[in-house]
Amino acid sequence: MKHKSLILAVILLFPGLFAAAQVKDTVRILAIGNEWSADVCTRDTYAYFETGGQPVVIGYVVKTDADYAELAALAKSGEPAFLYGKVVRGDTSEREGVSLAQALKDERWDVVSLQTQSAQACRWETIDPGLGQLIKYVRRRTPKGVRLMYFQTWPYAHQSTMHWMAFGHNNRDMYRLLADVSRKFTDKYGLEVIPIGTTVENLRSSFSMEGDVTFADRLNCTMGSYAAAATVYEAVTGRDARELTDAYAPYTLENHVRREMAAKCAHFACLQPFEMTNMKTGTGSYGSEEAGLPNYDETKVPAYTLPDPLVMNDGTPVTSIAQWEGERRAELLELFRREVYGRSPERLEGQHYKVVLTDENAIGGMATRQEILIYFDASEEKYIRLVTWVPNGLDHPAPAFLMMNTSGNASINEDHSISYPDEQQLKNYVIHGFPAYGQYRHFYPLEMILARGYAFLSFYKSDLDPDFDDGFQNGVHPYIYKEGQTFPEPDQWAGLSAYAWGCSRVMDWLEEAQTSVDPHRVSTIGHSRGGKTALWAAAQDTRFAMAISNDSGCGGAAISRRRYGQTVRQIQTTFPQWFCRNFLKYMDNEDALPVDQHELVALIAPRPVYVGSAAGDMWADPKGEFLSLVHAKPVYELYGIHGLPTDVWPDARQPLFGDRMGYHLRLGKHAILGYDWVQYLDFADKFL
């Protein structure tokens, strides 16, 4: 196998086998198998981990066509019969003539995967006892606690000739054998699984794009490679691979929809590693031409008519503030609750609070950090763990930003005294491990926020709902089910409403149990699903003084009727846990919606509202996000507030600060960056 390079220059000189990587919190993965393992390791996997903010070293030990018995025999003999490769800081280097013992000693491996070719992996007799012997060998030579994972291979493509006759030239039959055998021996030997075979079959069965997945018996370099990398990433880290499809866009797979398809199939494979998931929707495949690829052409936006926020359901015009606040506002809230997000409960009896940590010298003395448990009732079974940073030295209660985080409180800052979830929480959320401390600190520029005199408050989304399609069994939802209830009713709350409900519980604490933050000067803020949450929380709870949405897209600030980028169908196919079941009626049927997202923005009136978009985030429909502000403007004008200074969508980096309305279009992709925060802080200086 030829020497390869992924990203940087190849390392040609190294002491011993290779220079060991010295990266804090690095995950070290060693794949033992044949060229298939090497294919996965040396293509997109390293870049996928790095894009997710997870430093990684990837090694692979290759012996062509070896079954487990031969691998075990070679290991026991110490014969230097393997090719050993390693990816460090993006560089791939290889060396022939290495023993398995040498490779195992080269790094303190966190994960070791085991793999053999599919034709052998389909039959139990080719696995036992060789696999058991190999497992014992590896466990004796690796640190205690190393994770052993079975690398589930994929069925061959139809044009393959390798061992193909034995399976009747039917890759579905071959997959069933692979899945059944892998289920049995992972159970027998207590191995975790990297279910690449299931990912590949998900792609084949759901999208009928064989040439984009495999060629003969090998993965191709487009969707197949991307999907395999997504599978390894989610299986090893426990983080949702779908969250990186905007951020990681290699030139081999520039089409966003295909990246999303690949990551989605990987995600469902990790949820059901031994069972194919068919993700076809409606009459065609999700993302196929039959179902409709996302539209990114403004000339193809269909003609549509928006519902008027200032017209009652019975057609009566709204002409006064009293009429808006006394009648129409309640109508719109009812429609959003019933048809889109679902109804949330009121606060529960017995809600109370407990400060469990205080650090008066956080962020180098800039702030006092606290952790507060917001218990939902007297039982103390369920709670939000709120983390707060309040600037030191103020002579008044601080204004604040409340932002739900998606990766755990510890991901916000490098401070190792920030609490991690306990073992039971990790189990409930189906997570194998959280990001490193401060891994996503660029999303939360605490020093900038604190220096401007603002407090920053945050909680982890999965304190309310774990954000995967679990049938609402692991979050707050079953905690309030009625006797005999096992699932929300069609108009009851789903994930986004649970997150917004959590924001209101934080506001309860701000009003009732503390004095360092001004509860009358708190803005919700959020990115992506957090942006949807920020708008919905502020729309329902008028105690929030301002709302800021960053790249919130479909179901957030973007007009649904435009069908630009992500649509109602696509968001509910990918994230069915976010919306109430009644919202399913509007898949491919947006014109029947009794509301649209400009009315969500209008519900925040007369309070300040800001929408941030990204020019490269066409999936979120940045123009549609801007138009929600434009079409919410009449409600603000009812209060004598002028809103945006123009109805013309601005160029990138030309922020619009109007009268209690703001908007900007940032260069770049789906993220919340320093440029965004500068605009939000400037806007808050004027209006919060």
Where are these regions (language model features)?
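Alpha-helical cap/lid subdomain in secreted, periplasmic
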Residues: 97-222, 234, 243
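Conserved catalytic region of serine esterases and O-acyltransferases that act on ester linkages
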Residues: 25, 216-281, 287
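N-terminal pre-domain segments of enzymes
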Residues: 278-343
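Conserved SGNH/GDSL esterase-like catalytic core that processes O-acyl groups on lipids
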Residues: 27-30, 36-128
